[in-house]
């Protein structure tokens, strides 16, 4: 699938990856800002001008770390080899 379809899948709660990442355990997923905020019991308007947590794309890396705020490269955006990880 293409990058747009991969983004749609992320928004539906699915994990996605590029076929070239296979075997490395790498994938992307969406961290829902509102759910994260609720889990932290943060953002209930208790303080004036309290910020909210926005959603972001995270990557599980080959080194078994989580990178929050993953950014797509031009190659990633133009690729048609995106897959859904079950």
Language-model segments: residues:
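Extended non-catalytic interaction/regulatory regions in multidomain proteins
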Residues: 1-62
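Short, compact, well-ordered microdomains
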Residues: 55-86
């Amino acid at each position: 699938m293409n990058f747009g379809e991969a983004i749609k899948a992320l928004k539906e709660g699915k994990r996605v990856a590029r076929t070239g990442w296979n075997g490395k355990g790498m994938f992307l997923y969406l961290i829902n800002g509102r759910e994260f905020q609720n889990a932290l019991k943060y953002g209930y308007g208790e303080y004036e001008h309290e910020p909210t947590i926005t959603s972001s794309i995270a990557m599980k890396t080959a080194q078994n770390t989580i990178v929050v705020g993953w950014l797509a490269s031009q190659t990633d955006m133009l690729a048609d080899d995106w897959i859904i990880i079950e």
